[in-house]
Structure formats: structure tokens, C-alpha cells
Amino acid sequence: MALKTDIRGMVWRYSDYFIVGREQCREFARAIKCDHPAYFSEDAAAELGYDAIVAPLTFVTIFAKYVQLDFFRNVDVGMETMQIVQVDQRFVFHKPVLVGDKLWARMDIHSVSERFGADIVVTKNSCTSDDGELVMEAYTTLMGQQGDNSSQLKWDKESGQVIRSA
């Protein structure tokens, strides 16, 4: 295992906040082909009982990417040329994300292990509002290996998983 196991149990708090933008939500909804009116119109969101445009469910991945990049930029994980593939993710929403929300993030490293020559890291990512209320949690599994191309990873359509080939 090339990845440092002492990151297990580590808590990484993203030092900045993320404000959910109106046009950013609309652009994201268009990009992922979500055409629900609540993603575009304050009036449509109000009809559903919300004070602002609702962000698409996967919108928080933008913020999550900032948090992951910050972590890998600032924490010595033991590999300089690591190739990382996200192999699983699960979201648990506690409340909707709305335009204007000020969000904070924390990433907990739950486990670090090695399988088939690749390092597997499982994280729990928590997103809270400016007043500390839990908005959502994401459980992410990352697989990484040294960037020497000694093995190749590819997506297997039949199994729906990332597999390693020689």
C-alpha cells in the first residue's frame, strides 16, 4: 500500500464556504438535462414551498470537488502522482439546497485499505448551513494508484464497476 494509512480517522474541514448561485444552479440543471421548473424559477420553487430556486440534487458535487482538491493539495497522502477514480457515492439529504445558501464542508476519512493493488479510501462528507444545520451527507469511495500506468482501470458496462486489467 503506497497510500499513508495514518489519514484514516482524519477530519478535514474546508476553510472556506460556498454560496449557492442562481445562475450557477440554472446552468447546472441545463447541463444535466434537468428541466424541472423549480430549478429555474423562483415562482415555481415558491409553489413547492421554497423561498428560492432549488438546486438539482447533484449540484453539491461542485462544492465536493473543491473540498477534495483542497484536501489532496494540502495533505501528504503518500503519493505524488496518484491517479484517482471515484467508484461509488451515496447522498443523504436532510434538507434541500437553495439558491443563496451558504454552505460549509467537512470530510472524514472513514477507511483506507488496499485491494487488487489499488488503494481504497472511503470518506463521509458533511455539508452544513451557515447556522450549523446538517444539509446533506455524502459517502464517497475513491480508488487510487501510483501514476506509473503499470495497471489500467476501465469501466465494465456489464458489472457496472471499475475493473483493473493488466
Curated annotation (Swiss-Prot):
Single Gene Ontology MF annotation: (3R)-hydroxyacyl-[acyl-carrier-protein] dehydratase activity
Protein name listed in UniProt: UPF0336 protein ML1908
Listed CDD domains: R_hydratase_like
Family in the record: Belongs to the UPF0336 family.
One Pfam short name: FAS1_DH_region
NCBIfam families according to UniProt: PRK13691.1
Native source organism of the sequence: Mycobacterium leprae (strain TN)
GO biological process, one term: fatty acid biosynthetic process
Superkingdom as given in the UniProt entry: Bacteria
